[in-house]
């Protein structure tokens, strides 16, 4: 690990969500990407939603790396990502509309797997099946695509380079979906669509071996920013299973999703919202179902960038942040949306979980136990002053400073960045 905790000087920095997603990862990625040579997505698919506001224009990226907005940054969709090609081109159309030139600055791993219509249908069918537990997926085909990958039945982006072979694999996958799931789709329509997009991808040389590309970039001393999607508590292994996503959302996913060794990762910044939110089902120990929760939801505009679903809101949860630090080895924290807490008389912080009346130092793996935990809180004073124009830590109200210092004390790592508004420039670099 590098001594650089804020990512400004590191050669490879990973941006990891430390809660249940929607922490505001895209904003810091956007800020840092300007200083990096490469910006690389390593996991997930169009179930992610990174919203960025630049020059008054709002961009909602689901597949594109946020570095696409910078002319000096090469953007990589890594092998750990599952790619819906039509969705990708919808995002590229957004760039075309706003005259963002990305020529020669976007490549896709030939090992990344494809989300196709049959897998989208499988996702929708699974979620609507009343016999199964409702998991609250985004219905973007993510789970079925990773399932097909694990079953060695999936389609890869590189398969598009060999069209006749691709068609054989495509029809084989759809035959299995018909037989096993009863799924019928218009295969010829999708084939025609994919053929058109394939020609564009090939003409633009966008399908490449990204593992070799990144290895050579590292050898040449280029700086790489690894952009995570989702978050630690949604990780397929470490999250609140089964209310999780289907990929490795932690720092290990950087290695498996980009093909880089653990020793290459110098800085790991954990993105932490100043309170806690989660979308969909699953346990949420610090959840607020009262007026304060509604206030946070309304003031924070807590609605999913991908689905538009309202987010459940609660107090900051220190136990899950300690857990994220254990797994990811965060160098520092980017505390986002601090401005949303403005106006609250008091702010609570969940500092410990109690199970059967005893403090525990772990996150229960069984949901039955996690649902039973009680939360021990401490209370700190809130602040009334508008903090959106603060540019340094010392300009923040003393109560806001104390809130941040308490978080640092409880976690044992520094807060290096502080978000105090939705705009790109509304962020404080804390010394």
UniProtKB/Swiss-Prot annotation:
Q: Which pathway does the database say it acts in?
A: Purine metabolism; AMP biosynthesis via de novo pathway; AMP from IMP: step 1/2
The protein's annotated catalytic reaction(s) are: IMP + L-aspartate + GTP = N(6)-(1,2-dicarboxyethyl)-AMP + GDP + phosphate + 2 H(+)
The UniProt entry's coiled-coil ranges are none
One GO cellular component term noted in the UniProt record for this chain:
cytoplasm
Keyword Coiled coil in the entry? The reply is no
Which sites bind IMP? Answer: 22-25, 47-50, 138, 152, 230, 245, 309
Q: What is this enzyme's EC?
A: 6.3.4.4
Q: Which UniProt key words apply to this protein? A: Cytoplasm, GTP-binding, Ligase, Magnesium, Metal-binding, Nucleotide-binding, Purine biosynthesis
Subunit text:
Homodimer.
Q: Which family does it belong to?
A: Belongs to the adenylosuccinate synthetase family.
Its protein name is Adenylosuccinate synthetase
Organism, by scientific name, is: Paramecium tetraurelia
The organism that produces this protein has a lineage beginning with: Eukaryota, Sar, Alveolata, Ciliophora, Intramacronucleata
């Amino acid at each position: 690990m590098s001594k650089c905790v804020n990512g400004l000087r590191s050669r490879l920095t990973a941006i990891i969500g430390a809660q249940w997603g929607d922490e505001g990862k895209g904003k810091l990625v956007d800020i840092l990407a300007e200083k990096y040579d490469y910006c690389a997505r390593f996991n997930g698919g169009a179930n992610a939603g990174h919203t960025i506001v630049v020059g008054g224009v709002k961009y909602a990226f689901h597949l594109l790396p946020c570095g696409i907005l910078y002319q000096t940054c090469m953007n990589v969709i890594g092998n750990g990502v599952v790619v819906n090609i039509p969705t990708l081109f919808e995002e590229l159309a957004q760039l075309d509309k706003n005259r963002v030139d990305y020529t020669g600055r976007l490549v896709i791993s030939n090992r990344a797997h494809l989300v196709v219509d049959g897998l989208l249908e499988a996702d929708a069918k699974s979620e609507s099946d009343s016999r199964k537990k409702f998991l609250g997926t985004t219905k973007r085909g993510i789970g079925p695509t990773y399932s097909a990958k694990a079953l060695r039945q999936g389609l890869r982006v590189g398969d598009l380079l060999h069209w006749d072979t691709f068609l054989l694999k495509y029809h084989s996958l759809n035959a299995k979906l018909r037989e096993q799931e009863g799924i019928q789709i218009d295969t010829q329509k999708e084939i025609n669509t994919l053929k058109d997009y394939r020609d564009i991808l090939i003409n633009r040389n966008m399908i490449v071996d990204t593992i070799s590309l990144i290895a050579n970039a590292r050898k040449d001393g280029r700086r790489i920013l690894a952009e995570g999607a989702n978050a630690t508590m949604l990780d397929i292994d470490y999250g609140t299973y089964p209310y999780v996503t289907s990929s490795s959302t932690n720092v290990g996913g950087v290695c498996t999703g980009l093909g880089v060794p653990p020793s290459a990762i110098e800085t790991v910044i954990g993105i932490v919202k100043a309170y806690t939110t989660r979308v969909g089902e699953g346990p949420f120990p610090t959840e607020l179902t009262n007026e304060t929760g509604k206030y946070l939801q309304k003031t924070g505009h807590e609605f999913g960038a991908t689905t538009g679903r309202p987010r459940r809101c609660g107090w900051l949860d220190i136990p899950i942040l300690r857990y994220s630090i254990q797994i990811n080895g965060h160098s520092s924290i980017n505390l986002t949306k601090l401005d949303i807490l403005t106006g609250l008389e008091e702010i609570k912080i969940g500092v410990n979980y109690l199970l059967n009346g005893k403090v525990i130092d772990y996150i229960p793996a069984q949901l039955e136990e996690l649902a039973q935990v009680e939360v021990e809180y401490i209370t700190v004073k809130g602040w009334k002053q508008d903090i959106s124009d603060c540019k340094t830590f010392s300009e923040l109200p003393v109560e806001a400073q104390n809130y941040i210092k308490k978080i640092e004390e409880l976690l044992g790592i520094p807060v290096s960045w502080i978000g105090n508004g939705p705009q790109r420039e509304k962020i404080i670099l804390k010394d």
